[in-house]
Amino acid sequence: MHLPPQSFPLTRKRRNRKDDFSRRLMRETTLTAADFILPVFVCESEGKREAVPSMPGVYRLSIDQLLAECAELVALGIPAIAPFPVISAEYKSADAAAAYDPDGLIPRTVRAVKAAFPELGIMTDVALDPYTIHGQDGITDADGYILNDTTVATLIKQALCHADAGVDMVAPSDMMDGRIGAIRQALEANGHENVRIMAYSAKYASAYYGPFRDAVGSAANLGKADKRNYQMDPANSNEALHEIALDISEGADFVMVKPGMPYLDVLRRAKDQFAFPLAVYQVSGEYAMLSAAFANGWLDREAVIMETLLGFKRAGADIIITYFAKEAATMLTRG
């Protein structure tokens, strides 16, 4: 960007900031409800609405309760949800077979939501950690190391299971090598060419995921283990661009950076480099951190929510996956 020479007092940058109308006219970034995807936690039973202690205001919902929530989301103009399953211990195994059960929790959720709200998009998680006894995102060898290609074969089954149930978008969050291309080819071969893939391309081995693992019930299974041999090192950004480039070449329709706030630089670099549909996930730890500050009166809730979400979009995000989606959309409706 090359501007002609400017100097004070002929140029006064405050001039356009003086009144609301001119501030609005020169605003470079705006938020709408159409920018958001709401992550939701879905559980078995009926009439169940169970609070997640580490995420104030977030609940584990049975399918019937989720449908009531979806009615509100549609009315607010939120285009999509991302359901995550709360899987009980009896359905967890070393081979994660429940992940591709056609009568499992997620396929039933997809069918129920699509029957009631066909216009609402659904993006399902393709990963094995809710279904494994060890809480890792894949199938392990005797030493606990994730077997990449064996895991990808299981992820293909999971993605096809979700596609058969009627999902709009599958979102592989596992960080296995080659899984986007393998899933894309399987979808094409099985008549699901219009099922989109949201690739968790730059998913970091972050300390911000704790409340999510509590919510889905995988924290106890994972214990003190970590996921550093497949999720990305928080120190790296060039590697993120390599991962994103690979996923685009393998057939991803959207790519994602996760978490959000600590990785705005990666988000900006990704948008500048690829100009490709780009999502960011404001993860559970970010939500919990802000919620704690709000509860103590340390930050203005509405102002900080909107500033944070605006920051994601200004940094390059086209899509913001956030637990604040419903609240933010309500605020935007008020104007």
Which positions does each model-derived feature cover?
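Alpha/beta enzyme core
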Residues: 2-7, 19, 32-37, 44-335
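N-terminal amphipathic/basic leader segments beginning at the initiator methionine
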Residues: 1-27
